[in-house]
Structure formats: structure tokens, C-alpha cells
Design a protein with these regions (language model features):
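Glycine-rich phosphate/diphosphate-binding loop of Rossmann-like nucleotide-binding domains
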Residues: 131-198
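Short, aromatic/basic amphipathic alpha-helical patches
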Residues: 103-112, 175-179, 226-230
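Structural motif
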Residues: 7-12, 61-63, 93-96, 144-146, ...
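N-terminal Rossmann-like NAD(P) cofactor-binding subdomain of oxidoreductases
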Residues: 94-102, 113-116, 168, 173, ...
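Adenosine-phosphate binding glycine-rich loop
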Residues: 20-29, 226-320
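Glycine/serine-rich phosphate-binding loop and adjoining beta1-alpha1 elements at the start
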Residues: 45-46, 50-136, 253-267, 271, ...
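N-terminal, charge-rich interaction modules
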Residues: 1-31, 38-41
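Rossmann-like adenosine-cofactor binding region
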Residues: 178-249
Length: 320
């Protein structure tokens, strides 16, 4: 049976405490320990599509600031997490695991199986959300975070599909012959749809959004610095509906909720290593700073064949 691992880290003290509950580690639960010891890493849950694929989620109880401030330590903990996962054919990366240490490249050099960052799946889900929200010609789409791997792939694909774009990357805007500006307020002005494609948020005032605008967001925390104004909508840009055969058990259900998935959906980045092992690809869908559109499309084909689909999921603002 194909098997994958998905690595995550604690997004805050509550998540670190939850990892302590799952691993029966009172030091983490009561916040005596900071999650920096390799022995604090633990299995969070098992996931599966019976008869098709098995997966294991491994929790690294380092907070975002810990991941960013000491990336060599973060890399070593990710290596330990892969070792804990056991026999797997691919490794996926969640949140800042996909950003630190060369966006997966340093980890790929240290382990013997493909490492995929989730960027192709995230980009695919964002594009599908835009397509279900706005038709080409109905107004411009703003892409915040267009200089990053996900934002660039989204912008290039939307341009191919005929959407008018406004980007926060002047360089990419020039190459696509579209509007670009460093001022985020200028970028989102007049846009009925805004894509928040950066890995981290807290960069845009909610007052800058047009009345009735839809923010399709994947940033953690949210792209905006506060809750959206009345009439505006935020969609979870990575949310995918689960196939009927998806199995997760008790701890998998707990993980779904604490990770922000909810009971009825998963995030696309988790599905990326799943699709990788099911398709028996030897190369990742995404690694490093670039997402190839062909790889994004290949992920979409596999995910769709397994009954994963984009779910238009309104969510509340999630700040720090």
C-alpha cells in the first residue's frame, strides 16, 4: 500500500499543548517544554483512503518564530520527523515546514524519498476557487504574494485564462503585461476578488478591500490585519472536500479541527504527498521557489480522480 508522511508544526501554544495531549507529554501540554527536543516530535494521526493509500501526520511542536529563527534546528527536527514516520514513499510539508530551509530543498537532500511542499496543490486550489467565484471579464483579480512560488503560478495561470490582473510584484507584472504596484492598497483597488497567496499574512488593511469583495486566502495568519468589513467574504483558499472513503479516526478528526480543516474538508497541501504516492511519481509536484504549471495540472488531475474537489468554504478572519 502506498504510504506518505505529512509534517506540521505548532501554530501557537494551544497547538503545542494539543501535541502534548496526543503524545502524553505533560511538559508540552502545560507549556513547561518548548518543543525543541527531538523527543518531543510525535505521531498526530493516521489518515487513509482504504485500499488506495495510507498516510501519517507527524507533529513538530516548534512555534512559527522557532521555525524561522533557527532554520538549521528546524531542518534537523524535520529529518527526525521523517525518521519517525517510518516506511513512506513521499513527504509533504505543512505551514512553515514548506518555507524554511530552502522551501524543502535542504530536507530533500537529507532523506531518501521525494519531498513536496504543497505549493502546486495550493496554487491549483486557489485558481479553482477564483474560477468558481468570478468569470474572466467580470473584473480584475488582485494577487497579493505574487512574487512567491504559489502567487506566481496563480497569476500566470489566471492570465492564460483571460483574467485581468493586479499584482504586488512589479517584475512579474511586467512579464505578464499587467498592472503591478508595491502599494497593496493600489493593487486591490477595484478588485472584486483578491487572492492572498503569501505564506504569511497581516499585510493588508481590511478597509482597502472593495465593498462586497471576496478574499480567497491561504496566508497564516490571514492576509488582512483584521476582520473583514460587512459584505466582504473570506474563503479558505486551500479547502478541499473529502472523498466519501476518507478515514481519519478519532485523532484524525481532532487534527482536522485544530489544523483549521473542519470536519468536512482537508487542505490541499496535505493531499499533495498523497497524490504523489498514488500516481507513483518519482519527482515532487513542488520543491524550492518555483511551481511549474504542468505539475500543478498533474496534481489537479490526480486529486480530482480521487474525488477531492475545491470547496467554497467561507471562514472567519484568523489573526495571531
Amino acid at each position: 500500500m502506498p504510504r506518505f508522511a505529512f509534517l506540521v508544526h505548532a501554530l501557537g501554544p494551544v497547538h503545542r499543548g494539543a501535541i502534548g495531549v496526543r503524545s502524553f507529554n505533560p511538559g508540552l501540554f502545560f507549556q513547561w517544554r518548548k518543543g525543541q527536543d527531538p523527543n518531543d516530535i510525535s505521531v498526530l494521526c493516521d489518515l487513509s483512503i482504504p485500499g488506495v493509500v495510507d498516510g501519517v501526520v507527524i507533529g513538530i511542536p516548534l512555534l512559527p518564530e522557532d521555525m524561522l529563527s533557527d532554520q538549521e534546528r528546524a531542518l534537523e527536527r524535520m529529518v527526525s520527523a521523517v525518521e519517525l514516520a517510518g516506511d513512506v514513499q513521499a513527504v509533504g510539508l505543512g505551514s512553515l515546514c514548506a518555507v524554511v530551509a530552502g522551501r524543502g530543498e535542504a530536507l530533500a537532500d537529507r532523506v531518501s524519498v521525494p519531498v513536496t511542499t504543497g505549493a502546486a496543490a495550493t496554487a491549483w486550489a486557489l485558481v479553482e476557487n477564483v474560477k468558481s467565484t468570478l468569470q474572466p471579464g467580470q473584473g480584475p483579480v488582485a494577487v497579493v504574494g505574487a512574487a512567491g512560488p504559489v502567487g506566481r503560478a496563480v497569476a500566470v495561470r489566471l492570465k492564460e485564462l483571460g483574467y485581468a490582473l493586479q499584482l504586488d510584484s512589479r517584475r512579474l507584472a511586467r512579464s505578464l503585461d499587467t498592472m503591478g504596484d508595491r502599494s497593496l492598497e493600489s493593487v486591490v483597488a477595484g478588485c472584486p476578488v483578491v487572492v492572498g497567496a503569501g505564506p504569511t499574512g497581516g499585510v493588508l488593511s481590511p478597509l482597502a478591500l472593495e465593498d462586497g469583495a471576496t478574499l480567497i486566502d491561504v496566508a497564516i495568519p490571514s492576509t488582512t490585519t483584521g476582520p473583514l468589513q460587512s459584505g466582504c467574504t473570506m474563503l479558505a483558499g486551500e479547502a478541499l472536500s473529502m472523498p466519501p472513503s476518507w478515514k481519519r479516526g478519532f485523532w484524525g478528526s481532532v487534527y482536522h479541527v485544530l489544523a483549521g480543516y473542519g470536519f468536512q474538508q482537508v487542505l490541499a497541501c496535505l493531499v499533495e504527498p498523497l497524490a504523489l504516492v498514488v500516481s507513483q511519481r518519482s519527482q515532487p509536484f513542488a520543491l524550492g521557489r518555483k511551481v511549474e504549471l504542468a505539475d500543478m495540472d498533474a496534481f489537479g488531475e490526480v486529486a480530482t480522480s480521487l474525488d477531492f474537489s475545491v470547496k467554497r468554504l467561507p471562514v472567519r478572519w484568523h489573526g495571531r
